[in-house]
A protein has these predicted regions:
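Extended interfacial segments that mediate partner engagement and assembly in macromolecular machines
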Residues: 80-86
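Short linker/helix segments within small regulatory modules
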Residues: 44-53
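Cys/His-rich zinc-coordinating "finger" modules and their low-complexity flanking regions
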Residues: 2-4
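Short Cys/His-rich Zn2+-coordinating modules
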Residues: 8-21, 36-42
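Short cysteine-rich clusters marking metal-coordination/redox-active sites
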Residues: 31-34, 56-59
Length: 86
């Protein structure tokens, strides 16, 4: 098994901007697992998987999953307790 490359949250910035229409890299995100609060830019991003997976850098909880298909995109925010848009 190969190790996935871990990037910072800026790697998902363009995709998040496209989906939400605002730059989310500076937006605070609260982990639903451990309660840590970090800017999206400081979260761990995995792109070597089916879609994009954004994890808490403190407890590795999956915060956001984004999967793109030919005609639609699935976004799962279930791992977050909150995402502050400003």
């Amino acid at each position: 098994m190969t190790e996935s490359r871990v990037l910072d949250g800026n790697a998902a910035g363009g995709l998040l901007l496209e989906l939400f229409g605002v730059d989310l890299t500076a937006a605070p995100c609260v982990c639903g697992g451990c309660g840590a609060r970090e800017e999206v830019a400081r979260l761990d991003v995995y792109v070597d998987c089916p879609g994009v997976v954004i994890r808490c850098r403190h407890c590795e909880n999956v915060l956001i999953t984004i999967v793109r298909g030919p005609t639609r995109t699935w976004v799962d925010l279930a791992g977050t307790r909150g995402l502050e848009l400003g």
